[in-house]
Swiss-Prot record:
It comes from Aster yellows witches'-broom phytoplasma (strain AYWB). This is Small ribosomal subunit protein uS12. Keywords: Methylation, Ribonucleoprotein, Ribosomal protein, RNA-binding, rRNA-binding, tRNA-binding. With S4 and S5 plays an important role in translational accuracy. Interacts with and stabilizes bases of the 16S rRNA that are involved in tRNA selection in the A site and with the mRNA backbone. Located at the interface of the 30S and 50S subunits, it traverses the body of the 30S subunit contacting proteins on the other side and probably holding the rRNA structure together. The combined cluster of proteins S8, S12 and S17 appears to hold together the shoulder and platform of the 30S subunit. The modification 3-methylthioaspartic acid is found at residue 102. Residues 8-18 have a biased composition (Basic residues). One of its GO terms (molecular function) is structural constituent of ribosome. Residues 1-21 are annotated as: Disordered. Belongs to the universal ribosomal protein uS12 family. It comes from the Bacteria.
Amino acid sequence: MSTVSQLIKKRRSSKTSKTKAPALSYGFNVLQKKNKHYSSPQKMGVCLRVTTMTPKKPNSALRKFARVRLSNGSEVTAYIPGVGHSLQEHSSVLVRGGRVKDLPGVRYHIVRGALDATGVANRKQGRSKYGSKLPKEKK
């Protein structure tokens, strides 16, 4: 416990929280040739490798993910949500923050329906999260 005189000399410092998606918080300045701090909601990237991974202990599946080089030069591992995808090496994708709880080291999601990542086919509910268009009604 601090005394009053100790607190007068030096006040309590507030804890600084670490960002959960650090690769989205900076960009490469071409003119100055160095990284500059500015946050982005999403960043564009190119797929380097598209493969599968098994989740942590109680769960069992083959989760699809991609290794992506972002526009700021950093490489991240991003999850591909939804059933089925058409991504392959050199595909352009949009990456947003958001971790996958049962995949260690995966802190980003690929946005479906943007750039080369097509929307999920035959999806009726929760379409906006998977980039699906409203299906045509039959007469």
